């Protein structure tokens, strides 16, 4: 969805039971908040659903969606991403960001040289990761979204500043002076 007025807050991972409930995966910091952001819409905005969380289940919630009455209706929605109006989401502290706000920002190194852009943001459990894209960058370059690696995020200016770890791009070589060759120990 290219609509900046909406943010993806969850996805339907399938049906739950035989009464039209869906299995809902929440992308919210507080997962149960997904039910409080008002009607949620599909990516294209063609469908809008009122969400009622019925109970927690493995990897999400069982939920009833308005207009979904049968298991077949729920099965048909598998993989559907749900979007909330940006105005319904809480404002964040200065050091927190919505993933959607980071995608597309220009990435600069600490010397002010343009490296590329933020292609996506992911979190697989150990913290946020930025995927960078741009000329001269390896395809799918991933960096940790930590204060040490990304000391500056300026949404208003449309940029992030990255202190790139040695060895990730270009001719940088990691410092291996404190490592022994494979199979040997330091004395």
Curated annotation (Swiss-Prot):
<feature type="region of interest" description="Disordered">
    <location>
        <begin position="167"/>
        <end position="187"/>
    </location>
</feature>
<dbReference type="InterPro" id="IPR002676">
    <property type="entry name" value="RimM_N"/>
</dbReference>
<comment type="subunit">
    <text>Binds ribosomal protein uS19.</text>
</comment>
<comment type="function">
    <text>An accessory protein needed during the final step in the assembly of 30S ribosomal subunit, possibly for assembly of the head region. Essential for efficient processing of 16S rRNA. May be needed both before and after RbfA during the maturation of 16S rRNA. It has affinity for free ribosomal 30S subunits but not for 70S ribosomes.</text>
</comment>
<feature type="domain" description="PRC barrel">
    <location>
        <begin position="94"/>
        <end position="168"/>
    </location>
</feature>
<keyword id="KW-0963">Cytoplasm</keyword>
<dbReference type="Pfam" id="PF01782">
    <property type="entry name" value="RimM"/>
</dbReference>
<keyword id="KW-0143">Chaperone</keyword>
<comment type="similarity">
    <text>Belongs to the RimM family.</text>
</comment>
<dbReference type="InterPro" id="IPR056792">
    <property type="entry name" value="PRC_RimM"/>
</dbReference>
<dbReference type="GO" id="GO:0043022">
    <property type="term" value="F:ribosome binding"/>
</dbReference>
<dbReference type="Pfam" id="PF24986">
    <property type="entry name" value="PRC_RimM"/>
</dbReference>
<dbReference type="GO" id="GO:0042274">
    <property type="term" value="P:ribosomal small subunit biogenesis"/>
</dbReference>
<dbReference type="GO" id="GO:0006364">
    <property type="term" value="P:rRNA processing"/>
</dbReference>
<dbReference type="InterPro" id="IPR009000">
    <property type="entry name" value="Transl_B-barrel_sf"/>
</dbReference>
<dbReference type="GO" id="GO:0005737">
    <property type="term" value="C:cytoplasm"/>
</dbReference>
<protein>
    <recommendedName>
        <fullName>Ribosome maturation factor RimM</fullName>
    </recommendedName>
</protein>
<dbReference type="InterPro" id="IPR036976">
    <property type="entry name" value="RimM_N_sf"/>
</dbReference>
<dbReference type="InterPro" id="IPR011961">
    <property type="entry name" value="RimM"/>
</dbReference>
<keyword id="KW-0698">rRNA processing</keyword>
<dbReference type="GO" id="GO:0005840">
    <property type="term" value="C:ribosome"/>
</dbReference>
<dbReference type="InterPro" id="IPR011033">
    <property type="entry name" value="PRC_barrel-like_sf"/>
</dbReference>
<keyword id="KW-0690">Ribosome biogenesis</keyword>
């Amino acid at each position: 969805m290219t609509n900046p007025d909406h943010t993806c807050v969850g996805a339907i991972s399938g049906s739950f039971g035989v009464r039209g409930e869906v299995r809902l995966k929440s992308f919210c910091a507080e997962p149960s908040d997904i039910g409080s952001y008002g009607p949620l819409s599909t990516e294209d905005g063609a469908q809008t659903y009122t969400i009622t969380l019925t109970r927690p289940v493995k990897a999400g919630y069982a939920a009833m969606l308005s207009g979904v009455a049968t298991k077949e209706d729920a099965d048909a929605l598998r993989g559907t991403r749900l979007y909330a109006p940006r105005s319904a989401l809480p404002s964040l502290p200065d050091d927190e960001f919505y993933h959607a706000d980071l995608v597309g920002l220009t990435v600069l190194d600490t010397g002010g040289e343009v490296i590329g852009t933020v292609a996506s943001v992911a979190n697989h459990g150990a913290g946020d990761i930025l995927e960078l894209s741009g000329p001269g960058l390896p395809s799918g370059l991933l960096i940790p979204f930590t204060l040490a690696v990304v000391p500056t995020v300026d949404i208003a200016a449309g940029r992030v500043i990255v202190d790139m770890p040695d060895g990730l791009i270009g001719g940088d070589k990691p410092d291996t002076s404190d490592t022994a060759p494979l199979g040997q120990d330091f004395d």
